Amino acid sequence: MALQLWALTLLGLLGAGASLRPRKLDFFRSEKELNHLAVDEASGVVYLGAVNALYQLDAKLQLEQQVATGPALDNKKCTPPIEASQCHEAEMTDNVNQLLLLDPPRKRLVECGSLFKGICALRALSNISLRLFYEDGSGEKSFVASNDEGVATVGLVSSTGPGGDRVLFVGKGNGPHDNGIIVSTRLLDRTDSREAFEAYTDHATYKAGYLSTNTQQFVAAFEDGPYVFFVFNQQDKHPARNRTLLARMCREDPNYYSYLEMDLQCRDPDIHAAAFGTCLAASVAAPGSGRVLYAVFSRDSRSSGGPGAGLCLFPLDKVHAKMEANRNACYTGTREARDIFYKPFHGDIQCGGHAPGSSKSFPCGSEHLPYPLGSRDGLRGTAVLQRGGLNLTAVTVAAENNHTVAFLGTSDGRILKVYLTPDGTSSEYDSILVEINKRVKRDLVLSGDLGSLYAMTQDKVFRLPVQECLSYPTCTQCRDSQDPYCGWCVVEGRCTRKAECPRAEEASHWLWSRSKSCVAVTSAQPQNMSRRAQGEVQLTVSPLPALSEEDELLCLFGESPPHPARVEGEAVICNSPSSIPVTPPGQDHVAVTIQLLLRRGNIFLTSYQYPFYDCRQAMSLEENLPCISCVSNRWTCQWDLRYHECREASPNPEDGIVRAHMEDSCPQFLGPSPLVIPMNHETDVNFQGKNLDTVKGSSLHVGSDLLKFMEPVTMQESGTFAFRTPKLSHDANETLPLHLYVKSYGKNIDSKLHVTLYNCSFGRSDCSLCRAANPDYRCAWCGGQSRCVYEALCNTTSECPPPVITRIQPETGPLGGGIRITILGSNLGVQAGDIQRISVAGRNCSFQPERYSVSTRIVCVIEAAETPFTGGVEVDVFGKLGRSPPNVQFTFQQPKPLSVEPQQGPQAGGTTLTIHGTHLDTGSQEDVRVTLNGVPCKVTKFGAQLQCVTGPQATRGQMLLEVSYGGSPVPNPGIFFTYRENPVLRAFEPLRSFASGGRSINVTGQGFSLIQRFAMVVIAEPLQSWQPPREAESLQPMTVVGTDYVFHNDTKVVFLSPAVPEEPEAYNLTVLIEMDGHRALLRTEAGAFEYVPDPTFENFTGGVKKQVNKLIHARGTNLNKAMTLQEAEAFVGAERCTMKTLTETDLYCEPPEVQPPPKRRQKRDTTHNLPEFIVKFGSREWVLGRVEYDTRVSDVPLSLILPLVIVPMVVVIAVSVYCYWRKSQQAEREYEKIKSQLEGLEESVRDRCKKEFTDLMIEMEDQTNDVHEAGIPVLDYKTYTDRVFFLPSKDGDKDVMITGKLDIPEPRRPVVEQALYQFSNLLNSKSFLINFIHTLENQREFSARAKVYFASLLTVALHGKLEYYTDIMHTLFLELLEQYVVAKNPKLMLRRSETVVERMLSNWMSICLYQYLKDSAGEPLYKLFKAIKHQVEKGPVDAVQKKAKYTLNDTGLLGDDVEYAPLTVSVIVQDEGVDAIPVKVLNCDTISQVKEKIIDQVYRGQPCSCWPRPDSVVLEWRPGSTAQILSDLDLTSQREGRWKRVNTLMHYNVRDGATLILSKVGVSQQPEDSQQDLPGERHALLEEENRVWHLVRPTDEVDEGKSKRGSVKEKERTKAITEIYLTRLLSVKGTLQQFVDNFFQSVLAPGHAVPPAVKYFFDFLDEQAEKHNIQDEDTIHIWKTNSLPLRFWVNILKNPHFIFDVHVHEVVDASLSVIAQTFMDACTRTEHKLSRDSPSNKLLYAKEISTYKKMVEDYYKGIRQMVQVSDQDMNTHLAEISRAHTDSLNTLVALHQLYQYTQKYYDEIINALEEDPAAQKMQLAFRLQQIAAALENKVTDL
């Protein structure tokens, strides 16, 4: 029976080892990116939606069906079906799966893709290749999902009610090319009137309003009872914030009356941390009494609390209660509720005023109640789980036995298993790595039986078990797993789920892992037992499972046979064993394992270690103390005095027994005196004894087994004992402790005689050391013997001799002193107090008593000396003087550092500096301290040169290097070290390496030239969830530092990847680049650097590959996972095998033509003389076998194959063929040469565009960050209107409307202001104003410029009543239209601004579109402007000719190759106290250009209008000790005849890294030559005798003499050469294309919100066309184009400074003009036929113009289809503008300026008013005369 049990135990251990092996997860890999996952609960089939594919897998992820869904011909702007003839922009487009849902009742699958505006299809669940429904020609009504890959779509298949229609509820964000529908309900079955996927009813959609600027990202959709819910994030722009919203609506509500949304917020338990912001995933489950919404939220690094994620819970009963409370508050609450409530997707809500109980009476809302409804008063939850530094990306929840388990996906590729406790806390109990550093996608789905979990990464889906209970072989491991699924099934002896344990419901039969402990023995009675006794052991077991009559327990004691146990309550009674193991040596007991087993199945229950003691062994545990050792242990042993033995206690003890724990009753000897005994001297030792009755009269002996002596003991009369020691000797130590034994007749009597033997001579070589010995030792210095001995061994003692100095350290010191001197020698005193004076080289040296060593060492601190000096050392020790010999001298000298190298390094430190100088080896290394601006530089090498490693600095710049010795700084000639910006890592490739390493990793960035030491470092931390495949082997954390780099320059470093452990997936690997003191993560936006397991290769069959003359084929797995064809190497013997193909499983290479010799030749075995085939990937090599060439030759002689008759014929044919081939080859080479040149040109342009665009996007990230931080510099309303209305006037920014200054004498000001207010009232009379305008327009001298200015004045004057202004404009416009219609030229209307009303329209549009510019269109316009500016300034710009290398304008193109180099200069702004600022410039920039770039960078956080002018600042360069002011022109300027070249940085030889100082100085303080400004602004320089140039001289003036003599042909050649540079236009255009497209889309995309003014005016134009029977679409198109795009957008595009606080340079303006012209061309319907003679600007955008034209057409069409804006809505909108901005305008000044026109045409106006009947009735002429009298201070005739 025992053997059976041990076999079972062994099998259990083997099972345990097997279970520790890592479970290989089932997975499926897709060739394309995966998007969605769904699982059929009934069949277990898994469905995957991917890019261009659908997959149908079985439950174990084996492929059953695969269907291709793309790519297909499509364009987001085109309406399906797509025809290439109709959609010219169509191209092959990927189909991203946007929606994948199951409809099990109808056995069908719903799938929607991003192709064709997001249309959907129905497929059969049993076979996805069978498509049940698909229609791409139904138009907008069938557009369901988003066609933007970045906009999420969620959905839910359900029914409208019991027995109702099957419908699809859809939520999606509003993408740039979407139809604007946010939420919709779609049919899934055809009806008589509707197709599948059409809206359920006409009202079953919600569409974003035309003014909506919010964007949504939907996260989840679910249903609860009669309701459907959506979870989504919304990015609000006013105010800018991110919100997570929960929306609810009734399933049976076809009109969306019940739609209600409210905020969800997930708070951090830390009240100081910011709330979590964006919801990343959500799931609903019912763990207990009710359903709960589980949602994971993220928080970015900019928030307080740092980056991280949290899990929040929202019980749905609380959600419903809150939503009902919100509905009731809106329906029946006060009007003030509108602050809490709003109308989703734009609009206002009218709450309040409804009967109490409306919410209950109409649970799904009603038409008469407010809808849709949004509430800012939402639900808040506190995170039950937080994780810092990573995002939780997926969540799903399961319930097991009323316990809630959450499975969470992470951004680094793990699945976290979390137990959610009932009290609202959480506990993470497991973490499974599915794919390292791969984001787990949102679809995390449980199988139908809830036994498996499906998780999805980018291209893989995994099946994970929800629990692994059976992998825990013992109850302890099961309990320690803390897995809520698991518990210990007692009757089966294994870890199981509760449902798998047959008697789980019985008491203590299933022990849950998180609450109950394992079955254990808590106590035993008796607690121990003698090995010589027999009896019963009663074990208390808890928890003891309830046992039935059939259950029988067995006891198994050690190796004894098992026997039945008795069970009494919780006690189990076992019999003691018949045989007990031998007691181990040195112990007094042996522990025997008691095992309790269940007989049925021999199931192990628990075990207990039971001790059996042995008293005979107990007496020998303590040396020389047999009795005390016996009775003092924990057992019940007793000492028998008669027999001198230890035995078990008896119930009735006899006399002569020392009982247990009565050790004081033992006979014993103690108290020796003396306690110390000198060596080599006989010593009398006395000691005492007690309890000696049993040894009286016996012979006693004392001795030691260690020193092998035994002496007799004599008893003194006083009752004490004595013995005399022999001369004992032991030279190994100074002292030797002895425990002496006492024996009586050979038996040990307990002895506590502990003495110490000591040796005076040991370690005391001189007198001072001897005197310093312990006084108890009584050591004395014996002069005659010159040694230290016991005092009794020396006849005469002598005093100590004088001190002896043998050496000093160090031998040199600085003049400043302060360093420690160590004096070594002998007889240097007995104690620190003996040292009375120390002198070093004649200078006092302060004694350091704490560092003193008796007799051998004195340490002191030297004081300063005035001059260098060398001298000896003197020490006064207790009145005795010791001097150093002549060869021991100390020198004072002055160390002097002279230079340091290198002179710059990274801000993070770690640079090794070498300091050169004289006497730097003064003192010792510990005396030297090097600092840089107070930060220590750790000294690592001391000698003639010092080396130290810099520490990190808080700031960058030049730091003074200071060296001090002994705390005193030494003279410094001004040695500086410059801290530069830490190196920046921008990219790296390749992205991964095999674990064996050795792959070349190219890291690119900036600033690498500063670095001395590079290393690629890998930090490997074992994953907790990983279990090693070998038992007894655990994974240890480690740090792997790679070998040095193999190449580096300033922008590139090449490493060889270091080797990491063989199983990289078992570790969390962090890869760093170590650059001196700076560490940077090897990670970019594309992801982190990865390690993958090494590939595996199959060895050649039989070890030899034969007949390999052409190709060698090797097989393996994962061959190309981290290796490319170019990197892989293969060898045949010693020669290379040329790589041809490398795939995941195959490698092909071409061997050398002749079989090479093997690398390692074997002598005997001919097989081994064949060359080896070696594959080398990085650092690792695989020898796959040997190769044998095919060396067979033909058996037929060559003379028979080629007889002599055939040879001449062959020669003739060959010559003919050769001649023909030669001709063909020559023609082919010419063709290939031309083709190669064309391809090279095309490739160079493409590469340049790609590189420039990449660089621009990187640079623009900083600009975008500035935009996000400081906002777009939009001008305030007044400045905007001033610039739009009046900046183009003749006075420009000096115009009185901009300055606001009225030249009116103060005494007259009140009268004038009162009169102007009356004039304002007069202007508010429509009759007066119409007459006024007509009269002015009839005046011949009233020019077009005057009309424009007059209209702008009128706009400001009437701004307070914009609805009245609009009415006037409306009236005048109708008159204008009538004129053009009568003249039969309606197309010409609005072409120019030749009338007052046309300018009024321009101003009206400018006013109404200000807010739209500020909120929407401004950002892409500003980014376009900044992108052009950055691109232009990236290359040379000729400051004189205003031409640039990078431009869109061919006339502004710099037609020459100018050599230039980018520089980064450090700029210090004087008197502003800021750190040096790095600024990027070009060495060919003029000083004014440099100033502008510096000002642009330094003051980037301030408005441009607050920047200093370039001519108001001075730029100073300090290359050394001198300073030089930089200016455009000075005495050093280069002259060539009459030409003078503008100075550049190259002229001054300013280099990269130079420091420039910018200071604001008055003109009078500037040197005369520095007061010059840009050449274009100096009139004197434009004179004939003083011409200036910058980069290129004008081609017609380079050399007039040559020009006159040159031929026409030479001039043509010059022009042709200039045309070569036109390719730059393509490069710049390609770089800026994305920004141009973004601007056009923001202005013309119909999906964007359209300002109401545009809709209102376009409808007005449509009405007028219809009224006048104008059916020509071209005419209406021209009207709309002339009224908005050309009248407003072109003006803003060409003049960004009208809306932004920016300065527009001429070269930027030139490129803006080209884009503006393209915009104008896009708005015309006429086709432009292009030819070679077409302007370059037209040719540049010839490809895109058709797209832009289509955008304009769609824009006009989309506006026409929008909901009409009523007059009332428009007037309300205008009134809001008036109310918000009128007070800021110079209305009074405008009235005054308007009156000037009245004054000028006074008589004509009076006559017109008197002739008009309406004006006569209102006495308008009289009122004007009164105003004139007041304003002109004259008496009228009235």
From Swiss-Prot:
Disulfide bonds join 78-87, 112-120, 250-364, 266-312, 330-351, 469-486, 475-518, 478-495, 489-501, 555-574. The chain crosses the membrane at residues 1198-1218. Residues 20-1197 are extracellular. Coiled coil: none annotated. Residues 803-893, 895-980, 983-1092 form the IPT/TIG domain. Glycans are attached at residues 127, 242, 391, 402, 528, 733, 759, 795, 844, 1002, 1049, 1068, 1099. SUPFAM superfamilies: E set domains, GTPase activation domain, GAP, Plexin repeat, Sema domain. Residues 20-466 form the Sema domain. Belongs to the plexin family. This is Plexin-B2. It comes from Homo sapiens. The lineage of its organism: Eukaryota, Metazoa, Chordata, Craniata, Vertebrata.
